[in-house]
């Protein structure tokens, strides 16, 4: 059996730009991409915490150290500057590998400062 697993996640990054007329994509600070193990041109899913919209695009490298999160092209209709996003990429693998898989998760504050890195999402308590 093949499973699709979370590969990397940027948790609660803030949109710094939204450019309807830029070639479609999402520009992400290179430091953020590396922290989550997301490659340039990799497919990503974006979950807008602010407005509830969910959409797919691909990652492009933003200037290293700039803290840029720029939603571009048609996707700019789905996010405004200041919106809080979760950006995720996924990987497929055999069931045996998936059972011990650990994603790369980067957590951010409201100013796109990376606060911590983790290899799991915490267990949700009741």
From Swiss-Prot:
Q: In which pathway does it act?
A: Cofactor biosynthesis; (R)-pantothenate biosynthesis; beta-alanine from L-aspartate: step 1/1
Which molecular-function annotations from GO does this UniProt entry contain?
A: aspartate 1-decarboxylase activity
Q: Which EC numbers characterise this protein's activity in its record?
A: 4.1.1.11
Instruction: Name one matching Pfam family.
Output: Asp_decarbox
Task: Report which superkingdom the organism of origin falls in.
Answer: Bacteria
GO CC, one annotated term = cytosol
Q: Which cofactor does it need?
A: pyruvate
Q: Which residues form the active site?
A: 25 (schiff-base intermediate with substrate), 58 (proton donor)
Residues modified as Pyruvic acid (Ser) are 25
Chief subcellular location: cytoplasm
- Enzyme class label: lyase
Cofactor note (record) = Binds 1 pyruvoyl group covalently per subunit.
Q: Tell me, which GO biological process terms does this entry list?
A: alanine biosynthetic process; pantothenate biosynthetic process
Question: What does its PTM field state?
Answer: Is synthesized initially as an inactive proenzyme, which is activated by self-cleavage at a specific serine bond to produce a beta-subunit with a hydroxyl group at its C-terminus and an alpha-subunit with a pyruvoyl group at its N-terminus.
Tell me the compartments it is located in.
Answer: Cytoplasm
Q: Give binding positions for substrate.
A: 57, 73-75
Record field: catalytic activity: L-aspartate + H(+) = beta-alanine + CO2
Keyword hit for Lyase: yes
Q: Which UniProt keywords apply?
A: Autocatalytic cleavage, Cytoplasm, Decarboxylase, Lyase, Pantothenate biosynthesis, Pyruvate, Schiff base, Zymogen
Q: What family is it from?
A: Belongs to the PanD family.
What does the annotation say about its assembly with partners?
Answer: Heterooctamer of four alpha and four beta subunits.
- Which PANTHER family does the protein's record reference? ASPARTATE 1-DECARBOXYLASE
The entry's function note states:
Catalyzes the pyruvoyl-dependent decarboxylation of aspartate to produce beta-alanine.
Please report the name of this protein according to its UniProt entry: Aspartate 1-decarboxylase
